[in-house]
């Protein structure tokens, strides 16, 4: 009979007691509070977008550097820049009247 009493004690201990339930008062959100919450969400989203823009640009630049250009293309662009700069300097010097 001791075994039966121990089983009864264990089952009584292991059973969770039912919590008493209380009514919860629910209030509707005021329009002003809702607008303030939406403004906060919009501000957070815009801040996040501005923070991610430089990161996205940097990732694109890294991808472009990883792909690379042939040396002849880089030399061609450098020559074009030099010719343009020299031409512009000759025009400015010629129009200065010296």
UniProtKB/Swiss-Prot annotation:
One of its GO terms (cellular component) is cytochrome b6f complex. One of its GO terms (molecular function) is electron transporter, transferring electrons within cytochrome b6/f complex of photosystem II activity. InterPro entries: Cytochr_b6-f_cplx_su8_sf, Cytochrome_b6-f_cplx_su8. It is a single-pass membrane protein. Keywords: Chloroplast, Electron transport, Membrane, Photosynthesis, Plastid, Thylakoid, Transit peptide, Transmembrane, Transmembrane helix, Transport. Unlike its orthologs this protein is not encoded in the chloroplast. This is Cytochrome b6-f complex subunit 8, chloroplastic. The lineage of its organism: Eukaryota, Viridiplantae, Chlorophyta, core chlorophytes, Chlorophyceae.
